[in-house]
Structure formats: structure tokens, C-alpha cells
Amino acid sequence: PNGAAIGPDGCVYICNNGGFEWHNIDGLLIPGGQGDNYSGGRIEKVDLKTGSIETIYTECDGNPLKGPNDIVFDKEGGFWFTDLGKSYNRQKDQGALFYATPDGKFIKEVVFPIESANGVGLSPEEDIIYVADTTPGRLWGYPITEPGVIRGPKSFGVHSGMHFILSL
């Protein structure tokens, strides 16, 4: 599992990336690649009172979640999450930003593709959703018009409507 957040119902919502393998690069352990024991990406709900675990999302519009990474709830009770995807020998999934409800009834892909959608967070006023794009070292900010809806394009191919915040 990667990111976790407490939902409005007091349960913990987990971004489970399904597992990956570790690489030792000059003594530094780096996560990467889909492991042999990969179990599929998913969003899980953990009831802290009973200990029960329920899988609430495994796909969006027929596309499987590959590596859910980080999650944040908004004041409306829904949540935003990123999916980093998985890397393979000579190819890599594109990442994405999603919006969903904790009841398991609504999930929407909001931005695709994102090279390596990692961290996600809301501005204090919850009018901007921030996405850390790790590989290129960038932080993107998208104006929110309503829960699960941003202003501007859904692709990084066109930059109007989104704010490039930082390049490392």
C-alpha cells in the first residue's frame, strides 16, 4: 500500500499499488517495476472498528487501476487520488488523476496522461488540486470548479487552464 487518508466515515482509505519490486542501485533501494507477486491496483476501505477490508475500486471506465499512489479527501466527502502506473522492461504506464466517492459508486478519470502522477493535495480553500509529477520533477496545479471537475484541458499536451508550479 502507498497513500492513506481518513474518510468522513472514520474509515481509512488505502491506495494499494498491488506490489512492486525493489532495485539496489549503489546501495540505495529504489522501488520500481511490477513485481512477480503483483495483485492489481485498487482502492481499499479499512474499517478501524472491525478491521474489515473492502475493495471499492479496481478500475475506471474499463481501464484497470495499475498503481494507486496518493489520496486526499475534500470537504464534500469525495476523494482525489493519483495512479502512478507500473513500469516494465521497455515500457511504462502513463499516470492519471482520479476523483471518486467513498461509497464505491462513482469514479472518474480527471487528468490523463501524467508521466508519473505521485503525490496529490488540495489548497487550503480547496480550489486547486496539486499533483506531483515525480519523474520530470514538476508540481502541477489545476483549478477546481466543483467536486471532481477541473477547469482547463484534461491532457498535459496543452497547457492552458493549468498552472505549472515548480520545476526541480
Where would I find each of the regions flagged by the language model?
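Sequence-structural signature of mature extracellular/luminal beta-sheet repeat domains
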Residues: 1-168
